[in-house]
């Protein structure tokens, strides 16, 4: 996909207002794109999560089973009216009829005297919705609307290129309050047991990760380490596709790969490095999040390559095992010498 085609997709989805349990505008934007794609079928679960399936039959019209599911969440930390429940700090904004509680994590200092914009039963920080400046996307909610837009863009890219194969896109709710949507979706029985689920995120920039150095092969998060075989496979596909990637832990937070992995799914992670995580700028000032447009473009290309990859399951593991075994054989005679 060209950058020129990618930009309006990003702008349309990332600009939508959202908060935990109030993801409707983002869901509508996603569905608006997907309904135009003849080879993408969409269904939802009873909790409002969205499951999209791309499938274009192979030679002879034989069915194709999806090997990968790409997952992203549709919410972002925000102020929410939750009647008769106290789920977080509560604030009565000027002119508002009801107090609102903040759902999602930010330092307590960032919650003092916030400037917000209301959307009925929820509110977001009063920040620019989407701007592209000097190669960086500055937005009110990169996390994780960028991930949602990447999946949509991947589907469009697969459709435009008439790619044969199948994959899933998972768009979930209420990640910011403890991976709630992903946990419910993982137990729904709607995702094939043998699929590899790849969590797509924007993750707080921490060394050695660097904004602008390409998409990141995320080996784990704050809570867990992801599947080694799946991670090796993604690294192999990236190399074969000539897409430069960074390889980092990214421990700034926990992502949905942890939830799916705990449910028994083989899970992996991809992300782009994020500035001003959860809108927390210098000196606890609220500020737009930002990511590299080039990193996002690279992530779309990588996801499309993964979706149609013919790399066999565990092929990368077998290759590594063979390489190490041959190397050990090379030095076998030296082991006979006394240390």
Q: Language-model segments: which ranges?
A:
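N-terminal hydrophobic/helix-forming segments and targeting peptides
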Residues: 1-339
